[in-house]
Amino acid sequence: MKEVKQLRTVTEARAITDLKAGRINGVHAWMLVDLALSTGLRVSEIAALQFKDVDLKRGYISVTRLKRKKKTKDTLAIGKDIIQHLKDYIASMELKRGPLFVGSRGPLTAQGLQRIWKRSIKLAGLPKELSIHSARHTIAVHLLKKTGNLRQVQKQLGHASPATTANMYADISFEDMQNGVNGLYDQQ
């Protein structure tokens, strides 16, 4: 199985902070990177987001997903930081309805968002193999580490089965393994 790259190092974290703050590659890149790293949505799910899918007062987004060949609507909680970024983005883009990501020629497609991601990664000096899917993997691993709740990660990512989530995202780093065995039987 091919290893999915994560955004790990301090340098990469700083570059991502720059991307999220809009200092690199403009308003679409800022929102795309922030949304990807804050929600774990697939690029196709981000491209499909509509203005009406975002509820900033209640702090959630509604996502249309394809599960077992059926479309479903999932509601995902979003954090305070992304809520503020969405407010700023919507105001700067003067959005009132329609797609959340719109370019000069109309709604941005998944491929268009991937091009924005790649250009942003390059401008930030990050490794080019960091795909937009890397953001999905990154949030999954961090959310699992923070909460220890596989079911929450499964729901966030929209997986039909917790086994899928566990097989793909329950990474254990060497550092985690060392921390786990060091002092295992020490008196507490």
PLM region descriptions:
Residues 1-188:
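Conserved catalytic core of the tyrosine transesterase superfamily
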